[in-house]
């Protein structure tokens, strides 16, 4: 155990030293060249990225009887279980929640995409080690293909969400009669795109960290479990009465992206420009940081 611990310390030290030296030797001209090369390689290998993404989707359901149908069934079963468990506690609050199962579904859908994609990116180098050793492919293709394969699954799950929405609207169960739809519902692609950019940034950072610090996989699992309860997925934000806790939740970029998504598909109202700019700033900053760290520490 002590030997393993010392190895992890050495890996962290190597990571911090290399990153520190990269920052000290930062040159705008050289970094522009690296970034240009990054996107040039992306364009060159875009067909390979498509194939890697397709492979990841197929492998995910390869040994399953129901196959890709799990993209419908899994979020649906999760919604039913969480509605039974938390419905009586939070679902009765009709003032802040129109239809609790649909409210829960939207939150769970986005959060599941975030966690599954980042975990896939985190382990992408390890799971593709045989290919990396034999064939040259730009390294960022591996975390990126993992994220995009989960985005495909996420997009399919949107169809399940539509079916759930129609069911509760038609039956009027659990406040479903209060659901509405208009033009603003079509704008859901905007927060989806922002979330995808944010996830790519986080995924690039995690994939690099995992190379130097293997325990990050377990730390990230614990972090995602805690994060689930720190984002208003199963409860409305208005139910939090402590001001400083509410302020911390609002700082979380996932909250702003989730709220934007709900404003479109659940409340069918214009998106808040303040939330939109805040979420976009977080997404672009995280992507920029992810690309910088990746180029600094991984030879593409």
Residue spans for each PLM region:
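Generic extreme N-terminus detector
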Residues: 5-6, 32
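Hydrophobic transmembrane alpha-helices and immediately adjacent juxtamembrane helices
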Residues: 14-298
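Short hydrophobic targeting helices and cationic amphipathic motifs
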Residues: 6, 10, 20-21
């Amino acid at each position: 155990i002590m030997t393993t611990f010392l190895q992890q310390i050495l890996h962290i030290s190597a990571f911090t030293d290399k990153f520190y030296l990269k920052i000290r030797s930062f040159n705008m001209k050289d970094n522009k060249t690296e970034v240009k090369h990054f996107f040039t390689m992306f364009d060159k290998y875009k067909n390979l990225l498509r194939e890697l993404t397709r492979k990841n989707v197929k492998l995910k359901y390869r040994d399953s009887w129901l196959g890709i149908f799990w993209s419908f069934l899994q979020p649906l079963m999760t919604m039913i279980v969480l509605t039974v468990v938390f419905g009586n506690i939070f679902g009765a609050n009709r003032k802040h929640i129109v239809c609790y199962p649909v409210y829960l579904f939207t939150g769970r859908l986005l959060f599941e995409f975030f966690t599954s994609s980042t975990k896939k990116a985190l382990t992408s180098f390890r799971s593709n080690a045989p290919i990396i050793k034999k064939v040259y492919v730009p390294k960022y293709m591996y975390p990126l293909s993992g994220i995009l394969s989960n985005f495909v699954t996420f997009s399919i799950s949107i169809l399940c969400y539509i079916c759930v929405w129609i069911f509760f609207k038609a039956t009027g169960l659990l406040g479903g009669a209060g659901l509405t739809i208009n033009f603003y519902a079509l704008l859901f692609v905007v927060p989806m795109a922002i979330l995808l950019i944010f996830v790519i940034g986080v995924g690039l950072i995690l994939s690099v960290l995992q190379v130097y610090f293997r325990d990050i996989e377990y730390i990230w699992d614990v972090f995602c479990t805690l994060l689930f309860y720190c984002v208003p997925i199963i409860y409305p934000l208005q139910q939090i009465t402590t001001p400083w806790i509410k302020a911390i939740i609002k700082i979380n970029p996932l909250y702003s992206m989730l709220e934007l998504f709900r404003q479109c598909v659940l409340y069918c109202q214009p998106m808040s420009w303040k939330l939109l700019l805040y979420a976009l700033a977080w997404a672009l900053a995280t992507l920029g940081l992810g690309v910088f760290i990746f180029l600094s520490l991984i030879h593409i």
